[in-house]
UniProtKB/Swiss-Prot annotation:
The gene is plsY. This is Glycerol-3-phosphate acyltransferase. It comes from Rhodopseudomonas palustris (strain BisB18). One of its GO terms (molecular function) is acyl-phosphate glycerol-3-phosphate acyltransferase activity. It catalyses: an acyl phosphate + sn-glycerol 3-phosphate = a 1-acyl-sn-glycero-3-phosphate + phosphate. The keyword Nucleotide-binding does not apply.
Length: 196
């Protein structure tokens, strides 16, 4: 089991490291995504290129790589391996080996691993994100609100191990959004649909 757990963590990391935003924008012939807007490789920054289809594809790719990592590990090693794969995929997205450990902020892959581990939690996350986005128009704030509530939701329904895992992922997600939080507090954070 130790071998399977270790392999799940590593494979999860490698899958999580795939930079779909960068790959798709390069294939589409746009400029280097890291030189646009926030410089992030995630779907929100892809949206700033004006390519909504590419942004949606990036969101889907980043989410599904997390889901795939979880489902593969679960089939081979059970729940513990699946959670390790989820952690690996999340860390891989944040710190991809292919991009000198400078990756995305983790929102899509957070949704993806949650979908693989407990799909009702992913639905709750998306509903909370959408509700906040429609009212506040800030992608970062929407993600933070949904991520804060997710571990509480998991704990409430008795999934203590998952609640602990997602509490850790939420702390990492908050850390990755530290600059966004500063801009939110200063009133300078860009709203959804705005180009920087």
């Amino acid at each position: 089991m130790i071998l399977i757990d270790t392999a799940s963590l590593i494979v999860g990391y490698l899958l999580g490291s795939i930079p779909f935003g960068l790959i798709l924008t390069r294939l589409a012939g746009t400029q280097d995504l890291r030189s646009i807007g926030s410089g992030n490789i995630g779907a929100t920054n892809v949206l700033r290129t004006g390519r909504k289809g590419l942004a949606a594809a990036t969101l889907l790719g980043d989410a599904l790589k997390g889901t795939a990592a979880v489902l593969i590990a679960a089939s081979l090693g059970g729940p513990e391996a699946a959670m390790l794969a989820a952690l690996g995929a999340f860390l891989g997205h944040l710190f991809p080996v292919w991009l000198k450990f400078k990756g995305g902020k983790g929102v899509a892959v957070y949704i993806g691993v949650l979908l693989g581990l407990f799909w009702p939690g992913a639905i709750v996350f998306c509903v909370l994100w959408l509700a906040t986005a429609l009212t506040a128009r800030y992608s970062s704030l929407s993600a933070l609100v949904a991520a804060f509530i997710t571990p509480i939701f998991l704990w409430w329904f008795g999934h203590l191990a998952l609640a602990s895992l997602f509490a850790i992922l939420t702390l990492l997600l908050v850390w990755m959004h530290s600059e966004n939080i500063k801009r939110l507090m200063a009133g300078t954070e860009g709203k959804i649909g705005e180009k920087k």
